[in-house]
């Protein structure tokens, strides 16, 4: 038996959730057991820049970008499951990290 862990990351949580729903439906159609999606903590990255190129250091502007992520575990993955995952057409802004683990 093989266990597959999918970690999905995106800047937009709506696009991420649509991709998660597509993956869950494909895995359930192939007959594998699934755990998740587990929402992971949102990571925020802040950038502070000066508004003026020359003076007024007190005048600054802050920008923030948020990283949303979900975790999906596929228990007892079959070759049909892997084929259905490879054929999925996910949004280009979703980053998918796949980890394969052997279970006893």
From Swiss-Prot:
Gene Ontology CC terms, in alphabetical order: ribonucleoprotein complex; ribosome
What are its GO biological-process terms?
A: translation
Species of origin reads Helicobacter pylori (strain P12)
Q: Which residues cross the membrane?
A: none
For this protein, the record's InterPro entries field holds: Ribosomal_uS10 (IPR001848), Ribosomal_uS10_CS (IPR018268), Ribosomal_uS10_dom (IPR027486), Ribosomal_uS10_dom_sf (IPR036838)
Q: Which PANTHER family match?
A: 30S RIBOSOMAL PROTEIN S10 FAMILY MEMBER (PTHR11700)
NCBIfam families, alphabetically?
Answer: PRK00596.1 (NF001861), rpsJ_bact (TIGR01049)
Cross-referenced Pfam families, in alphabetical order?
Ribosomal_S10
Concerning its family, UniProt says:
Belongs to the universal ribosomal protein uS10 family.
Quaternary structure (record):
Part of the 30S ribosomal subunit.
Residues in coiled coil: none
- Which keywords has UniProt assigned to this entry? Ribonucleoprotein, Ribosomal protein
Entries under SMART domains matching the protein: Ribosomal_S10
User: What's this chain's function?
Assistant: Involved in the binding of tRNA to the ribosomes.
Put simply, this protein is called Small ribosomal subunit protein uS10
UniProt gene name: rpsJ
Any one Gene Ontology molecular-function term assigned to this protein's record: structural constituent of ribosome
